């Protein structure tokens, strides 16, 4: 089939929808993107927030881009502005509250007898000397041999351990055991975190709270419900990978919309390499109410002697005329939005496929919320190098991350795996009081349906599960067919979108 004649609708202009459409357009196709709102980026978008009488360009902030995320890096290298972000080796503080009294003020090393007894301050980074040795071990080999990879892996783990500061030896020993265990004992998808870690007999409360915090922030799931397989994937990518920059964190000086969503939408208008590198065809404020499918024979479109294929139309809110027909539909929505759309579309010719998709979507865990409290901090300005992220751990209650915003006096306090907005705000108030985080002004951004929890026994639907109906799935809750078990994240969203784009493109050849 002539690629110019292939009609593709991408529903949703989040990171998944935009990246899928961009890759399709790069391949010479002409997708149309339909977005219900006026703003692109989905749940990873920019926001204009007023703090202290000044408007700051921030974002909804709940997504962390941590680890060797090849798909993000590939797209960012092609479309992003390198001045907007850098990848750096992790370097963050851990403050572990041991009691009920006030802890030290954020960003200040206040040392009183009360503070020393109630809050343990630590630091976790990678030793640069061992990172240099790791680079030598890998050499310039794109595919290093088994011995080189084993040596590089050992050096990577040692770099973490040597870079740790003020962490008790017992806790450090258990962290080392955890890293080895994650690499050598991959669990099943049906295995719970607590069952998987039971043989380690972890005793130190710091390690226990750190694991719980990792489940909350990376898997958006309470530890008792968390999937061991996806936790092990996070541990292996972040702390037990032979790749030199596997654990590097992205530090951006712009909001998430400016980082990648808008560049994907706008393309590379200055590029001479690709004829299709211009802006995507975006239909904003176009809510798709219903999918309408009719099976037609290819001869109706110029072919002969072939089985009927689905042709799709879209019913758009506020429009009497249907959009279409389309040869392919890419659903790049949240599970809840996709389910509502599919249930409204069950009367079409492909009802069996849609009913199966609706059943699969209804089986996914309900999303939990994430609170990001953007604060204008009341403290002496520090350079970006001096302002480290902080992991705030308590003996009871939710953990939180405090992320300083590059180039400003703002910081985001992030609480994940939350079930209620009011309770999340109360937890944030307690954490601020407990750790002495003083702000001049703040603004709470609560994403009620932030990400699908990575509960044990849950498998992500495959991106091509419904390819026979020319219906494709893209999103952070979709499997990309690689066999890697990532939690719901921006990277998993991009990987599923890439898989969709490649599959549709391959079908044209």
Predicted features along the sequence, with ranges:
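N-terminal Rossmann-like FAD-binding beta1-loop-alpha1 element of flavoenzymes
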Residues: 6-33
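Mid-domain catalytic core of redox enzymes
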Residues: 27, 286-425, 429-430, 434
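Mobile amphipathic helical/loop "lid" adjacent to a hydrophobic cofactor/ligand pocket
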Residues: 73, 77-78, 82-228
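Conserved Rossmann-like nucleotide-cofactor binding loop
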Residues: 16, 39, 336
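Glycine-rich FAD pyrophosphate-binding loop
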Residues: 25-48
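Helical element adjacent to the flavin cofactor pocket in flavoenzyme catalytic cores
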Residues: 237-318
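Conserved flavin/dinucleotide-binding core of flavoenzymes
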Residues: 48, 106, 121, 127-128, ...
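Conserved FAD-binding subdomain of flavin-dependent enzymes
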Residues: 52-87
């Amino acid at each position: 089939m002539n690629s110019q004649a292939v009609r593709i609708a991408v529903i949703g202009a989040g990171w998944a929808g935009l990246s899928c459409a961009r890759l399709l357009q790069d391949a010479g196709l002409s997708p149309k993107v339909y977005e219900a709102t006026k703003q692109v980026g989905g749940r990873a978008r920019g926001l204009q927030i007023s703090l202290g009488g000044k408007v700051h360009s921030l974002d909804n902030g709940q997504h962390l881009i941590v680890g060797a995320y090849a798909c993000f890096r590939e797209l960012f290298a092609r479309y992003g502005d390198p001045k907007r972000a850098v990848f750096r080796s992790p370097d963050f503080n851990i403050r572990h509250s041991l009691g009920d009294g006030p802890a030290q003020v954020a960003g200040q090393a206040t040392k009183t007898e009360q503070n020393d007894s109630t809050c343990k301050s630590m630091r976790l980074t990678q030793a640069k000397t061992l990172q240099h040795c790791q680079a030598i071990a890998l050499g310039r080999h794109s595919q290093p041999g088994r011995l080189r990879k084993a040596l590089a892996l050992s050096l990577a783990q040692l770099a973490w351990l040597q870079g740790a500061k003020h962490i008790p030896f017992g806790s450090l020993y258990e962290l080392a055991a955890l890293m080895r265990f994650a690499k050598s004992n991959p669990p099943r998808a049906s295995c719970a975190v607590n069952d998987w870690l039971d043989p380690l007999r972890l005793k130190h409360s710091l390690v226990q709270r750190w694991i719980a915090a990792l489940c909350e922030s990376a898997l958006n799931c309470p530890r008792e419900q968390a999937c061991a397989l996806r936790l092990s994937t996070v541990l292996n990518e972040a702390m037990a990978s032979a790749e030199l920059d596997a654990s590097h964190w992205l530090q951006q000086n712009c909001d998430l919309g400016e980082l990648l969503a808008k560049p994907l939408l706008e393309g590379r208008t200055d590029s001479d390499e690709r004829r299709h590198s211009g802006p995507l065809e975006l239909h904003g404020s176009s809510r798709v109410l219903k999918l309408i499918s009719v099976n037609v024979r290819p001869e109706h479109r110029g072919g002969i002697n072939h089985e009927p294929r689905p042709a799709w139309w879209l019913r758009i809110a506020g429009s009497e005329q249907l959009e279409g027909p389309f040869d392919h539909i890419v659903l790049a929505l949240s599970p809840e939005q996709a389910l509502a759309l599919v249930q409204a579309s069950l009367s079409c010719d492909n009802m069996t496929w849609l009913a199966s998709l609706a059943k699969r979507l209804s089986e996914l865990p309900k999303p939990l919320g994430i609170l990001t409290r953007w604060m204008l901090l009341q403290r002496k300005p520090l350079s970006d190098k001096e302002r480290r992220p902080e992991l705030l751990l308590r003996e009871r209650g939710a953990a939180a991350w405090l992320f300083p915003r590059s180039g400003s006096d703002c910081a985001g306090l992030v609480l994940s795996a939350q079930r209620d907005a009011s309770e999340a705000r109360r937890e944030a108030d307690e954490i601020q009081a407990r750790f002495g985080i003083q702000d001049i002004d703040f603004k709470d951004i609560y994403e009620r349906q932030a990400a699908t929890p990575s509960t044990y026994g849950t498998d992500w639907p495959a991106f091509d599960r419904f390819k026979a109906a020319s219906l494709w799935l893209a999103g952070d809750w979709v499997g990309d067919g690689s066999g890697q078990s990532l939690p719901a994240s921006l990277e998993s969203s991009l990987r599923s979108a890439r898989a969709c784009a490649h599959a549709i493109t391959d079908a044209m050849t």
